[in-house]
Amino acid sequence: MNPLLNTLQPYPFAKLRKLLEGAKLPEDLKPISLSIGEPKHPAPDTVKQALFDHQALFEKYPPTGGYPELKEAIGNWIEKRYGVKLDPASQILPTNGSREALFALTQVLIDPTQDPVVVMPNPFYQIYEGAAKLAGAQPYFCPMTAETGFKPNYSSIPEDVLKRTQLLFVCSPNNPTGTVLSLEDWRK
């Protein structure tokens, strides 16, 4: 067993679900749950029908790199939305969600033989820390406080940490604060 597993924190959503277990909601109010970012609405009927119509695709494993048609559709959407042309064959890799992609990316990029650091905002999306630790890197937390406008202050990172940094996580809008970095923030 990988001994680095012992360094991981409990996943916060499991903890949150346990805290919310048995909570009584006021009967006269219809609260909106902002606790866990999971779908709150059923899939549209058109999506359900498309899945039904193409259920034969689910009878075998998909291609490792994703279906070419899906990758091309993603590339077309990115080009239309952002004006960026990507090569679907070499620059687009569908995943089952952001956690899978962020974890895999971290494992690929980190060289644990070089005393690596992964810089991440704090508060942060839990997978950043777990992926860094399991890749053999030391997490370095950039605090986001009222004083920094709830934005990470990367200029406060010590030089020795920067020299060892192999990966920097940036999320805008930030999860969980919702803070959006301006173009000027990105330039810093």
Where do the model's predicted regions map?
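N-terminal small-domain helix-loop-helix segment of the aminotransferase-like
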Residues: N6-G97
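Extreme N-terminal starter segment of soluble prokaryotic enzymes
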Residues: M1-P3
